[in-house]
Structures are given as structure tokens and as C-alpha cells.
From Swiss-Prot:
GO terms for molecular function: electron transfer activity; heme binding; metal ion binding; oxidoreductase activity. Heme c 1 binds at residues 129, 132-133, 264. Pathway: Energy metabolism; oxidative phosphorylation. The keyword Metal-binding applies. GO terms for cellular component: plasma membrane. The gene is ccoP. Gene3D superfamilies: 6.10.280.130, Cytochrome c-like domain. It is a multi-pass membrane protein. This is Cbb3-type cytochrome c oxidase subunit CcoP. It comes from the Bacteria. Keywords: Cell inner membrane, Cell membrane, Electron transport, Heme, Hydrogen ion transport, Ion transport, Iron, Membrane, Metal-binding, Oxidoreductase, Repeat, Respiratory chain, Transmembrane, Transmembrane helix, Transport.
């Protein structure tokens, strides 16, 4: 009898019993009337008359009127008092439950070390990301982003070489730039060391040259001198200050991203917690690209 603990089930059971009783009552009344009553009353003027059978000018039965009135009253109660419009949705309930779970999840795992974060991120990657990016995260021969290189200098070099479909920024798609590998590496070194919050590069000797190229090759035209991609307080291009960080990854997970093959959908519906996004970012950063 656990189902009686839910007031909706109780309400439905009572309503079903009421309907059953009324049905039995009305059915018995009609059967009795059909058996005992005689034709009487006035026929409607200009009413239907078929084979000598006419249509009486009777009033609407009391039972019908009562049914109509009860239905109207019930509908009014249902929409304005019982379950007001927009007061509840299954999606909203799901989101609230996930939010509560994420709070417990983060409280439980808030003191994870670096290795544990990477392990957690690997688990998230294998469940949600490996189908497109591959078990090795190398992008399945170009069908998806190579995450071994993404978020690092190698990822910037790939973007310079091949361009980027982007994330529906006002600047549109970024075209490929005609730069040799050395110049691309210099720009990547400058971005990772001076613009990105990562503040780290494997080639510190190329930072100054990278800055010159970043300004002279037109990168500032879209990304701005500070790399934030803002123009007139609008997001015009990718924010390079967040490149390689969990904030950049969170933006992609929230909005999705165009690719050369297909389109990465938004993962906003997954309701990843901040800790899960951080763990996934740590895992991606732990992947070591091969030297070109």
C-alpha cells in the first residue's frame, strides 16, 4: 500500500471511485427509465422527424448540467490552485535534484589531490567524450578535436595552421594563417605565457617574437590586445586568456562547438558540477602531445 503515500495516487483513486459510483447510478437510472417511461412531452417545432420518430423539446438533463459544472470547477481549481501554470516541470525538478546531488558530490570530493582529479576526469572523458574524441583523445583521425594537443601550445599551432569553425562568435570562422611552423610556435608560446591564465610555455625564448607576430599578423583585430576577444563590450572572438583552463572548457561544454566534421552539441543538460569540469580539464591537460 505504499502507493497511498502519494497524494496524487490517493486523489486519482478517490476520483475513480466517484466516477464508478456515478456511472452505476446513471446507468441504472437510464435503464429503469428506458423500461418504465412512456413517450411524453412536446415535439420541437421544425425538429427532426424520421420514420415517425420526433425530437422532444426537453431541457438538458440535470446530470449533464452537474457534470459540466463539476468539470468547469475542477478545471479552474486544477489550473489556478492545484497545479498553477508554470509552477512545476519535470525538467525543473530534475535540475533541482541534480543541483542538490552536485552539492553533496563536491562536498565529498573537495579535497582531491592532483592525481585523483586526473583519474576522475579520465572517467568522465571515457563515459561522455571518448565516443567522438576516441579512447586516446586524439580525435579519431580528424573527425573530432585532438584533445591531446588542445589547450596547449600545440593546439594553438593547429588552429593557426587549419583555422577554427568557432562557437558562433561575431567574428565568424577563423581562417588558416599562412605561417611557417616556427612563427606559429612563437605565437603559441606568447599566448600561453603572456595571455592565457596558464602562464607557462615550453619555449620562453620565443615569447618576444610571438608578441610581435601576434600584433603584426592581425590577431589583435579579433582577439584584442589583451586577448579577451571583446569589442564594444561584446564577445567578438574566443577569449584567449581562458585558453587551456577549465573556464574555456566549461564554455565549450555549455555552448557546443562547430567542427570540420559535424557539430559538438551542448552538454549543458548534463549539469556537470564545477568539480567535474575541473577534473576533466585536469585530465586533458595531463595528456602529453608528441613533439612535431
Amino acid at each position: 500500500m505504499d502507493f497511498l503515500n502519494d497524494h496524487i495516487n490517493v486523489f486519482g483513486l478517490i476520483a475513480a471511485l466517484v466516477i464508478l459510483v456515478l456511472t452505476i447510478y446513471e446507468s441504472s437510472s437510464l435503464i429503469k427509465e428506458m423500461r418504465d417511461s412512456k413517450s411524453q412531452g412536446e415535439l420541437m417545432e421544425n425538429g427532426h422527424l424520421i420514420d415517425g420518430i420526433g425530437e422532444f423539446a426537453n431541457n438538458v438533463p440535470v446530470g449533464w448540467i452537474a457534470s459540466f459544472m463539476c468539470t468547469i470547477v475542477w478545471a479552474f481549481w486544477y489550473f489556478f490552485f492545484g497545479y498553477p501554470l508554470n509552477s512545476f516541470s519535470q525538467i525543473g525538478q530534475y535540475n533541482e535534484e541534480v543541483k542538490a546531488h552536485n552539492q553533496k558530490f563536491e562536498a565529498k570530493w573537495k579535497n582531491l589531490g592532483q592525481k585523483e582529479l586526473v583519474d576522475m576526469g579520465q572517467g568522465i572523458f571515457l563515459v561522455h567524450c571518448s565516443q567522438c574524441h576516441g579512447i586516446t583523445a586524439e580525435g579519431l583521425h580528424g573527425s573530432a578535436q585532438n584533445l591531446v594537443r588542445w589547450g596547449k601550445e600545440e593546439g594553438i599551432m593547429d588552429t593557426i595552421k587549419h583555422g577554427s569553425k568557432g562557437m558562433d562568435y561575431l567574428a565568424g570562422e577563423m581562417p588558416a594563417m599562412e605561417l611557417d611552423e616556427k612563427d606559429a610556435k612563437a605565437i603559441a608560446s606568447y599566448v600561453m605565457a603572456e595571455i592565457s591564465s596558464v602562464k607557462k610555455t615550453k619555449n620562453p625564448q620565443l615569447i618576444d617574437k610571438g608578441k610581435e607576430l601576434f600584433e603584426s599578423m592581425g590577431c589583435t583585430g579579433c582577439h584584442g590586445n589583451d586577448g579577451k576577444g571583446l569589442q564594444e563590450n561584446q564577445v567578438f572572438a574566443a577569449d584567449l586568456t581562458a585558453y587551456g583552463t577549465e573556464n574555456f572548457l566549461r564554455n565549450i561544454l555549455t555552448h557546443g562547438k562547430k567542427g570540420n566534421i559535424g557539430h559538438m552539441p551542448s552538454f549543458k543538460y548534463k549539469n556537470f558540477s564545477d568539480l567535474q569540469v575541473k577534473a576533466l580539464a585536469e585530465f586533458i591537460q595531463s595528456l602529453k602531445p608528441l613533439e612535431d
